[in-house]
């Protein structure tokens, strides 16, 4: 199985396989960016409205992400309320545009607006001799910065 049942996006196992293939292309000079994002205050959302609403928001986020990324972008669940998106053929400038659009779409989504759902993201791009793991570590640090700086934002590292 390649799809995460709760969210409708790719699962982590599929992401690991496909990301290694995309990394090889990046090593040959193609642009590659990576975004880790999560739902802000997800625990509070679950505590306030219950897990059914939390699950519904995860599913809705999956839909919004798929609708607002290109067909060759790899949208996957990273775990919990965290998602990871691989953006092939995308430099950091273009990736930031994609990420900001996604952040705004979530904030304005009719189903999510009732629960004040927002997302924060950490963005990075391939650097010489990178591994997927190194890219994930940088994106995760950038996500932590976005949370620390007030949430509902994208940070780059």
What spans do the regions from the language model cover?
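Short, conserved alpha-helix that lines the donor NDP-sugar binding/gating region
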Residues: 16, 20-23, 136, 140-144
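Active-site-proximal structural segments of metal-dependent nucleotidyl cyclase/transferase enzymes
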Residues: 18-49, 65, 76
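Signal-transduction coiled-coil helices of two-component systems
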Residues: 22, 106-109, 146
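Conserved phosphate-binding and hydrolysis motifs of nucleotide-dependent enzymes
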Residues: 46, 50, 54, 79-82
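Short, conserved catalytic or interaction motifs in soluble domains
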Residues: 47, 51, 88-92, 111, ...
